[in-house]
UniProtKB/Swiss-Prot annotation:
<keyword id="KW-0503">Monooxygenase</keyword>
<protein>
    <recommendedName>
        <fullName>Putative monooxygenase GME11364</fullName>
        <ecNumber>1.-.-.-</ecNumber>
    </recommendedName>
</protein>
<feature type="domain" description="ABM">
    <location>
        <begin position="9"/>
        <end position="99"/>
    </location>
</feature>
<comment type="function">
    <text>Putative monooxygenase; part of the gene cluster that mediates the biosynthesis of dibenzodioxocinones such as pestalotiollide B, a novel class of inhibitors against cholesterol ester transfer protein (CEPT). The biosynthesis initiates from condensation of acetate and malonate units catalyzed by the non-reducing PKS pks8/GME11356. Pks8/GME11356 lacks a thioesterase (TE) domain, which is important to the cyclizing of the third ring of atrochrysone carboxylic acid, and the esterase GME11355 might play the role of TE and catalyzes the cyclization reaction of the C ring.</text>
</comment>
<dbReference type="Pfam" id="PF03992">
    <property type="entry name" value="ABM"/>
</dbReference>
<comment type="pathway">
    <text>Secondary metabolite biosynthesis.</text>
</comment>
<dbReference type="GO" id="GO:0004497">
    <property type="term" value="F:monooxygenase activity"/>
</dbReference>
<dbReference type="InterPro" id="IPR011008">
    <property type="entry name" value="Dimeric_a/b-barrel"/>
</dbReference>
<dbReference type="InterPro" id="IPR007138">
    <property type="entry name" value="ABM_dom"/>
</dbReference>
<keyword id="KW-0560">Oxidoreductase</keyword>
<comment type="similarity">
    <text>Belongs to the LsrG family.</text>
</comment>
Length: 120
């Protein structure tokens, strides 16, 4: 008998930071990144930047959770409060959040672990 698939969700957050405050953004993001990646249900977290538009970042998080958990449990974690408070001072516009449920099975999944060899 096959195991019941675990729910999985991908969270994509677009942030538009004042280009003069990028270093401050990275500094205030580190404690949040460390807290999120320490969560047992977090399976992936990467930050991307838009090379054509300074100050635009995309955070991509993958979770072994469903959207209900993300909206009713995860977003209420205490470590987000100081992060969001600090962000208000440097964002040029409100952040945008998109949630996606993972396709079932592994037909549409691949991970090249060699790309992450420097991770502890």
């Amino acid at each position: 008998m096959a195991a019941k698939p675990t729910p999985s969700v991908s969270v994509h957050i677009r942030l538009t930071v004042d280009p003069n405050k990028i270093n401050e953004f990275l500094e205030i993001s580190r404690p949040m990144f460390d807290a999120v990646t320490a969560e047992p249900l977090n399976t992936f977290f990467e930050m991307y930047r838009d090379d054509k538009t300074p100050g635009v970042f995309k955070l991509v998080e993958n979770w072994d959770a469903d959207i209900d958990y993300m909206m009713n449990v995860q977003v209420k974690k205490e470590y987000y409060t100081p992060y969001h408070t600090a962000l208000r001072e440097i964002l040029l516009k409100p952040h945008e959040v998109e949630l996606y449920s993972r396709m079932p099975g592994n037909e549409w999944a691949k991970l090249d672990v060699k790309r992450y060899v420097d991770q502890e």
